[in-house]
């Protein structure tokens, strides 16, 4: 079987660098799944913008494809980073760049406008994410782009361009992104994209990354997605 390389784009609301939780998760993940992991270092806002990160990660991806054409490449990310991998894959499809074999998104932020009225019902349940803070961060990150640009808010894109990738999405019921993620997964399926949605009942944002027993089941699902990509 061809070797798999994972490009992991970390979250942090577009304003934070990689943190120890990410690194510990990636250590467990690489060991369980037996894959190589590349973690692009992008400059968060206000030092960098979406356009900068897209340039950097696209360069890494195209170089990897040229040097190792035989490898499977899976894009993976959490939170803001999981929103970004969809934006990147959509952008690559429109540019005619080869699609990643798999996309694995953990608690993805798929609509930077956060305009879905259903979000209000989840604010009390979510101990991690703050809507007002995310609004500010999204505008800083967008730079010259609009926050509703499909590269930043992939829920607004023509998702049929992702048909060449297998998509796996994981989300908890106790996070403000939950209604958007469920809607997004439905839109992917409707657009003809092979999509698996895994819902963590009573789980919080980014729960598969946390060092808790409940993270083992999603890790196994991620491993299966790797094998099937």
For the regions a language model picked out, list residue spans one by one.
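Alpha/beta-hydrolase superfamily serine-hydrolase fold, recognizing
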Residues: 1-229
């Amino acid at each position: 079987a061809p070797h798999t390389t994972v490009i992991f784009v970390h979250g942090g609301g577009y304003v934070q660098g990689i943190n120890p939780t990410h690194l510990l998760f990636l250590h467990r993940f690489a060991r369980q799944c037996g894959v190589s992991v590349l973690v692009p270092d992008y400059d968060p806002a206000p030092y960098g913008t979406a356009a900068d990160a897209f340039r950097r990660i696209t360069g890494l991806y195209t170089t990897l494809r040229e040097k190792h054409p035989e490898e499977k490449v899976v894009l993976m990310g959490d939170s803001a980073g999981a929103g970004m991998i969809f934006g990147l894959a959509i952008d690559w499809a429109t540019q005619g760049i080869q699609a990643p074999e798999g996309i694995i998104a953990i608690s993805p932020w798929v609509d930077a406008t956060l305009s879905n009225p259903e979000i209000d019902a989840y604010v009390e349940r979510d101990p991690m994410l703050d809507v007002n803070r995310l609004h500010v961060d999204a505008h800083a990150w967008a730079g010259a782009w609009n926050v509703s640009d499909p590269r930043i808010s992939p829920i607004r894109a023509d998702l049929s361009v992702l048909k060449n990738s297998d998509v796996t999405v994981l989300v908890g019921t106790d996070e403000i992104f939950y209604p958007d993620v469920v809607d997004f997964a439905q839109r992917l399926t409707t657009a003809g994209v092979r999509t698996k949605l895994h819902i963590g009942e009573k789980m919080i944002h980014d729960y598969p990354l946390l060092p808790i027993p409940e993270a083992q089941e999603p890790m196994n699902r991620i491993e299966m997605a790797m094998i099937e990509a």
